[in-house]
Curated annotation (Swiss-Prot):
Disulfide bonds join 2-24, 7-20, 11-26. Blocks potassium channels Shaker-IR (with inactivation domain removed) and hKv1.2/KCNA2. This is Kappa-buthitoxin-Tt2b. Its main location: secreted.
Amino acid sequence: GCMPEYCAGQCRGKVSQDYCLKNCRCIR
């Protein structure tokens, strides 16, 4: 599954974590 930590890790240093979390389909 897709987890917050995973999404944040994917975009770390690229864009804000908030952006990643909102763009993670598996997350609300």
